[in-house]
């Protein structure tokens, strides 16, 4: 009821340490981004940041005691390297030049469905001169644009590390079953690509363990 919401708002504003624990699920619905934006403004409105124990906590995933460069190995990239923001994929496929993007590898993502400026993304994916490889478990919106569709393993079929959004625990997960059919994990895909491209760095000769 409106009265209850007003009373709850007053109790929140008057609390000794107004604190909000904000999860990730809220952002994954219609108008989710604006809902999250409004909620994150509440501590500032009531002065919660000036009170010990007050404020807001969202994801802790950026605080893991884990160095991602051990996996991404950016030191192996040639310099300089052009970087393309995946949130501007539509712009990259349609307007970026010098040189133009002519090949696209998609894994662990479905940009045709979730990337901003969807119309531009779909126009880019529809280009006749764009060679698109999709590594996927399902026939997603993006997979329908693939020139080559490679089967990917599920979480039950490969080793992985999981970092939590809400705590400081890193969990190692072992496969429950072997890969089904001809499916590969992300690691196996890029390890084999490196071998076919003549990249002999020992990093790519490691197993997933």
Which residue stretches match the model-derived regions?
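Non-catalytic alpha/beta scaffold blocks inside enzyme catalytic domains
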Residues: 1-51, 59-209
């Amino acid at each position: 009821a409106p009265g209850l919401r007003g009373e709850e708002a007053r109790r929140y504003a008057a609390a000794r340490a107004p604190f909000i624990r904000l999860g990730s699920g809220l952002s994954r619905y219609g108008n989710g981004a604006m809902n999250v934006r409004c909620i994150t403004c509440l501590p500032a409105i009531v002065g919660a940041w000036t009170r010990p124990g007050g404020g807001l906590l969202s994801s802790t995933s950026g605080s893991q005691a884990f160095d991602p460069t051990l996996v991404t190995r950016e030191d192996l990239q040639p310099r300089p390297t052009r970087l393309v923001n995946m949130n501007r994929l539509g712009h990259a496929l349609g307007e970026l030049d010098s040189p133009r993007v002519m090949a696209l590898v998609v894994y662990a993502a479905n940009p045709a469905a979730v990337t901003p400026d969807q119309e531009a993304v779909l126009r880019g994916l529809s280009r006749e001169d764009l060679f698109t490889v999709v590594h996927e478990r399902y026939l997603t919106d993006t997979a329908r644009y693939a020139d080559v569709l490679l089967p990917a393993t599920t979480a039950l079929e490969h080793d992985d590390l999981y970092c939590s959004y809400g705590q400081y625990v890193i969990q190692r997960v072992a496969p429950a079953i072997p890969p089904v059919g001809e499916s590969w994990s992300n690691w196996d895909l890029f390890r084999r690509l490196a071998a076919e491209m003549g990249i002999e760095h020992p990093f790519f000769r490691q197993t997933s363990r």
